[in-house]
Design a protein with these regions (language model features):
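Alpha-helical bilayer-embedded segments of polytopic membrane proteins, i.e.
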Residues: 168-196
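Active-site acidic short loop of glycosyltransferases
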Residues: 20-23, 36, 48-49, 111
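Catalytic donor/gating beta->alpha subdomain of glycosyltransferases that bind UDP-sugars
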Residues: 47, 53-77, 104-107, 111-176
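Conserved nucleotide-sugar donor-binding
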Residues: 21-23, 95-110
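A short, glycine-/small-residue-rich helix N-cap motif at loop->alpha-helix starts
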Residues: 2-11, 33, 119-120
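Short aromatic/hydrophobic "clamp" motif used to bind/position activated sugar donors
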Residues: 13, 25
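Short acidic donor-binding/metal-coordinating loop in glycosyltransferase active sites
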Residues: 16, 22, 30-32
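Acidic donor-binding/catalytic loop of UDP-sugar-dependent glycosyltransferases
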Residues: 29-45
């Protein structure tokens, strides 16, 4: 009966990881592309013998319109949170639009075993479970960036946000709680400025 709820995306990722010829795996998504031809070198260049995870950033370009500005702002805040947290030795998530980890690490943590029944979480929940301050590195250089295609419909963006929110309650540690508190305080600050 549990097989009914198995995420096809996670199954596809698992089969891909199993079939991979080399230990270092690098991921992006179909709606993203590297900004230049040095992306592979930049991301893989972050590995040392101790490194098992490399986190990168995927930008959302400066498209015209309020909706695109909102998405770009949200994407920037999310990136700042997870990358700065990892840089301060508290990694808690990654983003599948620009992410690398070792095949060995994937199987050491039994892949997506902890979240097979969830449709989302192939990137954030796995990194949340497997990352440590010792095994995680951030690469943020012009060569390491990817870029997401423009999102044209509110429903698509909302689905992405709901999907991410559905996995947040499974995060270990209290890093995400801190960032939720920070977001709430920022919202209250803006509301108080507007009210004055």
């Amino acid at each position: 009966s549990d097989a009914r709820y198995l995420s096809r995306r996670k199954l596809a990722f698992t089969l891909g990881v199993k079939a991979a010829k080399y230990d270092i795996l690098l991921f992006t998504e179909a709606n993203c592309q590297p900004l230049n031809d040095q992306w592979l070198s930049a991301m893989v260049g972050g590995y040392t013998p101790e490194t098992s995870i490399v986190l990168g950033y995927c930008k959302y370009s400066n498209y015209k319109g309020f909706f695109h500005k909102l998405i770009a702002y949200d994407n920037l805040l999310t990136g700042l949170r997870y990358l700065s947290s990892a840089l301060s030795h508290h990694p808690y998530i990654g983003n599948g639009r620009n992410l690398s980890y070792r095949k060995e690490l994937f199987f050491k943590h039994k892949g997506y075993c902890q979240s097979l029944n969830l449709h989302a979480g192939d990137d954030d929940l796995f990194i949340n479970e497997a990352s440590t301050k010792e095994n995680t590195k951030v690469i943020y250089t012009p060569d390491s960036l990817t870029e997401m295609d423009p999102i044209e419909r509110f429903g698509v963006w909302k689905e992405m946000k709901v999907s991410r929110a559905a996995t947040q309650r499974y995060y270990k540690g209290n890093t995400s709680t801190f960032y939720h508190l920070e977001s709430t305080c920022f919202f209250l600050f803006q509301a108080s400025v507007i009210a004055m």
